[in-house]
Amino acid sequence: MAEDTYSHKMVKTNHRRCRTKFTEEQLKILINTFNQKPYPGYATKQKLALEINTEESRIQIWFQNRRARHGFQKRPEAETLESSQSQGQDQPGVEFQSREARRCRTTYSASQLHTLIKAFMKNPYPGIDSREELAKEIGVPESRVQIWFQNRRSRLLLQRKREPVASLEQEEQGKIPEGLQGAEDTQNGTNFTSDSHFSGARTW
């Protein structure tokens, strides 16, 4: 109860980015593109951003949210590449998609990760003010900070869902669950420790 009250106060006092509201015409363009290509590459997202006059990061988040609402699963890279290569000659559109430039994964230094992780432990749901302050402190765009926090929350939630099963199996073998020993995928914002303030899934 105390933790819930604490989280509520944090969210209430921390300003959040206003939700991007797209016009009917913008949504028509986005939905049409989504129906053809639910996993657009970086070049496509840049083109869409110019076409509807918004930031590329807003396009990326819109596609992420829409895929989540429609139950899309992240496609394995190997499967995607194999599919593109096998169909590329017969379908120019697929060939173009496979060659399309993608945004490079943001790589953080140890110092930047330390700052991000420390901030996450204090507040897993930072508002726009906190994210902009973090972005300025570590020298990256605010949109990268937002995505880092999103990835960290979703992966931590997934790990916690798996922990009960893993704990039971390891307990039967008399071992300590590996997932509870602090394994971390730092570049993607994933910390698997169980002492975080993270309290479950939440929609941005």
UniProtKB/Swiss-Prot annotation:
Pfam assignment, any one: Homeodomain
A GO MF term: DNA-binding transcription factor activity, RNA polymerase II-specific
Record-level GO cellular component terms: chromatin; nucleoplasm; nucleus
Main location: nucleus
InterPro entries with a match to the protein in the record: HD, Homeobox_regulator, Homeodomain-like_sf, HTH_motif
GO biological process: regulation of transcription by RNA polymerase II
Polar residues: compositionally biased ranges: 81-90, 184-197
Record feature DNA-binding region, as residue ranges: 15-74, 101-160
Origin superkingdom: Eukaryota
Swiss-Prot/TrEMBL keywords: DNA-binding, Homeobox, Nucleus, Repeat, Repressor, Transcription, Transcription regulation
UniProt cross-references to SMART domains, sorted A to Z: HOX
Tissue spec. comment: Expressed in embryonic stem cells.
Localization per record: Nucleus
Residue segments, region Disordered: 73-101, 163-204
UniProt function note: Transcription factor that acts as a repressor.
Homology family: Belongs to the paired homeobox family.
Name of the protein in question: Double homeobox protein A
UniProt organism field: Homo sapiens (Human)
Name of the gene encoding the protein in the UniProt record: DUXA
